[in-house]
């Protein structure tokens, strides 16, 4: 009986010894929300023009997207200590997941209906802003949360 007890204690100890490394090997980060970052420069003398667009139509569209549950938040960040070649602004948009192609098209149609503009009109408006606003890059990032 005593030998059996020792064997049981030894078996339990060994199983714990092997279980601890398995727990320790679990990746310490989990996938979080997606963050879309658009890098923008604005020509001198047009900061008010672009700020007015951002505070108006851009913000209205983001508020609608948030109300629909498509995004979780958005913000505009200014590059305070800008170096040559860097953007003036970063437009940030956060979402829990990314839509597939069909869902993306569905959302685009809902947005066009909301703003009462065709794709051609939206492109023309973007072209008008491109006279003083320049998108110099974009990134899609994913937040990594600690366990």
Where do the language-model regions lie?
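Generic detector of solvent-exposed, compositionally biased contiguous segments
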Residues: 24-26, 39-41, 59
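Short, solvent-exposed mixed-charge patches
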Residues: 146-147
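N-terminal, post-signal-peptide region of Sec/Tat-exported proteins
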Residues: 43-90
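Acidic/histidine-rich, surface-exposed loop or edge segments in extracytoplasmic proteins
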Residues: 30-45, 89, 102
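Bacterial N-terminal signal peptides that target proteins for export
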Residues: 1-14
């Amino acid at each position: 009986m005593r030998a059996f007890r020792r064997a049981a204690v030894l078996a339990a100890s060994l199983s714990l010894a092997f279980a601890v490394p398995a727990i320790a090997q679990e990746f310490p980060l989990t996938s979080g929300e997606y963050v879309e970052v658009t890098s923008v420069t604005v020509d001198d003398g047009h900061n008010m023009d672009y700020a007015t667009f951002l505070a108006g139509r851009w913000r209205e569209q983001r508020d609608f997207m948030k109300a629909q549950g498509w995004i979780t938040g958005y913000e505009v960040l200014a590059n305070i200590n800008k170096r040559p070649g860097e953007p003036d602004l970063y437009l940030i948009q956060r979402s829990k997941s990314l839509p597939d192609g069909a869902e993306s098209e569905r959302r685009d149609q809902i947005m066009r209906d909301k703003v009462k503009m065709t794709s051609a009109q939206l492109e023309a408006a973007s072209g008008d802003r491109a006279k003083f606003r320049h998108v110099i890059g974009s990134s899609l990032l994913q937040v990594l949360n600690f366990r």
